[in-house]
Amino acid sequence: MNSLFASTARGLEELLKTELENLGAVECQVVQGGVHFKGDTRLVYQSLMWSRLASRIMLPLGECKVYSDLDLYLGVQAINWTEMFNPGATFAVHFSGLNDTIRNSQYGAMKVKDAIVDAFTRKNLPRPNVDRDAPDIRVNVWLHKETASIALDLSGDGLHLRGYRDRAGIAPIKETLAAAIVMRSGWQPGTPLLDPMCGSGTLLIEAAMLATDRAPGLHRGRWGFSGWAQHDEAIWQEVKAEAQTRARKGLAEYSSHFYGSDSDARVIQRARTNARLAGIGELITFEVKDVAQLTNPLPKGPYGTVLSNPPYGERLDSEPALIALHSLLGRIMKNQFGGWNLSLFSASPDLLSCLQLRADKQYKAKNGPLDCVQKNYHVAESTPDSKPAMVAEDYANRLRKNLKKFEKWARQEGIECYRLYDADLPEYNVAVDRYSDWVVVQEYAPPKTIDAHKARQRLFDIIAATISVLGIAPNKLVLKTRERQKGKNQYQKLGEKGEFLEVTEYNAHLWVNLTDYLDTGLFLDHRIARRMLGQMSKGKDFLNLFSYTGSATVHAGLGGALSTTTVDMSRTYLEWAERNLRLNGLTGRAHRLIQADCLAWLREANEQFDLIFIDPPTFSNSKRMEDAFDVQRDHLALMKDLKRLLRAGGTIMFSNNKRGFRMDLDGLAKLGLKAQEITQKTLSQDFARNRQIHNCWLITAA
């Protein structure tokens, strides 16, 4: 009896144990990452030929304690290598694990290689050669703490390489994991199986091979036992012949069918090639088709299983499309696949929740470094009384109501950018802004007392409902998470796409960027204030401080300002402002752009202006500013400097976003100024719910 070890992906150990026992293995013992078992020579070959789950089958040779590199060398050399393989065979060493002595895996592999070579040369035998790419023998050494485990890898290449996959293609899941997913899906061979996001077809091919009794090792050309001195070619040929006979019989007797589709024509072509190479191409129908076009291929029965490994996203900007995809799949399953089973394998359990289906079973597994889950569902047959469940129904109803109200209003006003929803319902704590045919959903970061999983699921429901109610393409929804602004945080960069969208606001054309920054380049709540500046600016010299992207300057210029001066500390935003001005034909010396610390510039400037707009941050301690700034504390000092630049009869429009801001009217009077609050006049319909989003004042000489 041989003592053997079969490795596998984390989470598949018990499944592998059952498979090995069915092959005839005895004394099976599950450990993390694999199964120890025993079997005769025939079982060695059968496990290599028939295991669909094992990553490798290894023959343990011994263990040794490693307190020095010499311990490793002597421990390896103690094995009788001349009984393992002939000197004419090539070999390679795979070394994994480190300790205080062996701190580099390459160094560990070199010491093992030296010990093996010396074991031959000391017996006056020819030195075996190393071949890292295609060796006859693979030696596996795993170092854990002070113990090195040494084994012969009888597999050669990993057993997931069945011999049918185009090696140029990147598989999101290995074939061994795909086989496990099939086994756990609840699908019964002999019933239909459909994968609507099949990629290169791995799940369907593994299922078809399982259903037709085709051994996973049947198409492999190389094995790790070819140079093994104890290899029994006669028994191996018997095992191989039996596998060939069973495969022919299984294919001839199989009567059901498999269906695969994907939106990518190139991967569908690869899937067809892979299926043909696997010997089961005639059983699978592959189509180029998007999930939105998915239909039941057997509407009159029999019932089958939909099995897939749908895409998932690691970036926030990919989530809206994936949420829409999963929501759509859930609706299609309910509408077209009543009575069928559904099984999905995913690295994102939250996305699976978008199906709006209740899972009957779930399994955990690792896909490389990713923690994944497989959930199985039974789709109830629909009845005449069945009504589709609405995702986030209260939110959807409010959004639909707001859309009806604001869409017509915005069209009459001549604006393309407006707020559709602003945390109207406390449990749906987001803002939804429309920018032409795009939508930005801003999630207000939930308090730490709210369960993170529930908050994320609520957000996914919001996105699915938003896409459904507004009827937009998922790739036209941008998702952001917003926290309370502190200083310069509003200017932090989120991406590098550099994609700008031209929008219209009254008679102005402006560039917005929906993805690269937390804000888009256009503060929607200041829309009316900008229009007022345009109406007040005819024939006047206009100054815009803390100008951001210069949208207020554009309105002033279009309103007939004699000159405009735009000041901001950010080169990025000044360049953006210049683009906005140029878009509206506002170029030349009359329109100056100045990069400077606005407070420092204000103290040093000696020019005069008729109309000044200033919208400073609530608080700022930017390294590039000379002093920290607090709008409540410092607004009088600001007004003192502004008064010096204000021409007789001129006006300052002063705005800020500090909640509870209190204007020091007595202090203003001492400066010879008076203030008129116009906050309510500058709040448009879409911001009527949030009356503290900004406060705005007109300041003139007393």
Swiss-Prot record:
Domain THUMP, chain residue ranges per copy: 43-154
Alphabetized Pfam families for the sequence: Methyltrans_SAM, RlmL_1st, THUMP, UPF0020
Role: Specifically methylates the guanine in position 2445 (m2G2445) and the guanine in position 2069 (m7G2069) of 23S rRNA.
Record-given protein name: Ribosomal RNA large subunit methyltransferase K/L
Keywords: Cytoplasm, Methyltransferase, RNA-binding, rRNA processing, S-adenosyl-L-methionine, Transferase
Keyword check for RNA-binding: yes
Transferase is among the record's keywords: yes
Primary gene name: rlmL
One annotated Gene Ontology cellular component of this protein: cytoplasm
Signal peptide: none
Family the entry assigns: Belongs to the methyltransferase superfamily. RlmKL family.
Database matches in HAMAP family: 23SrRNA_methyltr_KL
InterPro entries: 23SrRNA_methyltr_KL, DNA_methylase_N6_adenine_CS, RlmKL-like_Mtase, RlmKL-like_Mtase_CS, RlmL_1st, SAM-dep_methyl-trfase, SAM-dependent_MTases_sf, THUMP_dom
SMART domains: THUMP
Reaction(s) this enzyme catalyzes, per UniProt: guanosine(2445) in 23S rRNA + S-adenosyl-L-methionine = N(2)-methylguanosine(2445) in 23S rRNA + S-adenosyl-L-homocysteine + H(+); guanosine(2069) in 23S rRNA + S-adenosyl-L-methionine = N(2)-methylguanosine(2069) in 23S rRNA + S-adenosyl-L-homocysteine + H(+)
GO MF term (any one): rRNA (guanine-N7-)-methyltransferase activity
Gene3D superfamilies recorded: 3.30.2130.30, RNA methyltransferase domain (HRMD) like (3.30.750.80), Vaccinia Virus protein VP39 (3.40.50.150)
EC number(s) stated in the UniProt entry for this protein: 2.1.1.173, 2.1.1.264
Subcellular location per the Swiss-Prot or TrEMBL entry: Cytoplasm
EC top class named in words: transferase
